[in-house]
Amino acid sequence: MFDDKLSKDLLLSARANNNLAVIRILQDTTSAINPNLQDENGKTALHWAVINLNPLITCYILKIEKVNVNIQDNTGFTVLHYLAKTISNLKFTTINGSFYKSNNYSILKTLFEYGIDVNIQDNKGNTALHYAICKNNFFFIEELLSNNASPFILNKAGFSILYKLNTKNCNFKDEIIESLHSKYPESIELGLVDNKIIIYDIHKLLYNLPYFMYEHNILILGNDA
C-alpha cells in the first residue's frame, strides 16, 4: 500500500529540485512510495529530475522498486524526450580545470542502464531522436543510435529523422550519416551531391509511400525536390 503523502512529497520535491528533501524522504523506506505518481501535467518525479538535469535525484528515484522509466506525460513525452531537447552538446564540462561528465550525459547513460525505450513516440509522433536532430545534439544522437534508436520511424507529419536531418541546419550531418551508414549498410546507400553527402526522406505529400518505406527500411537519396 502506497503512502499518498510521501509519494506526493517526492513528486513536489523533485519538481522543486530539492536534493535534501528527496534524500530525506527516501532515506528510511521506499516501499511505501509510488514513484510513478503523476502531477496535473502527467509528469512524474523522474520527469522533473531529468527536466532539472539533476543526476543525483534521478539516481535516487531510479532505485525505487517498480519505477517506470517509460511513463509519458500529457504531451506524450518520456524523460528521454525532455533530455533530448536540452541544448548541451557536451559529454564533459570543466570545473576548476578538471573534466567531469556533463549532467545530461550522466543521466542518459543511467537511463540506458534501466532499460528505457528509445523509440517511444510523443503525441506528435516524434521520438527522442527527432528532437536530438533538431537540437544538433550530436553526442546524444550517437548514443541513441548505439542503443537501437530507429531512424526509420515516421512522425504524424510523415517525416523520419532523415527528412529533419536534411531540412535543419545540422552541424554534424556528415558524421550522423556516417553513423547511419555503418549501422544500416544494407538499407542506406550514400550519394554525393555538390561534394557533400545528402540523405533525405520522401515528402509527406506522398501518403502511402512513407509507410511502405518504413515497413521495408527503404530510403530515398539524392537531390531534394
Swiss-Prot record:
Database matches in InterPro entries: Ankyrin_rpt, Ankyrin_rpt-contain_sf
Q: Which PROSITE patterns match?
A: ANK_REP_REGION, ANK_REPEAT
Q: Where are the ANK repeats?
A: 6-35, 41-71, 75-120, 124-153
Entry keyword annotation includes Repeat: yes
Record keywords: Repeat included? Answer: yes
Give the keywords, sorted: ANK repeat, Repeat
* One Pfam family it belongs to: Ank_2
| Full protein name | Putative ankyrin repeat protein RBE_1025
Q: Which organism is it from?
A: Rickettsia bellii (strain RML369-C)
Q: What is the lineage of its organism?
A: Bacteria, Pseudomonadati, Pseudomonadota, Alphaproteobacteria, Rickettsiales
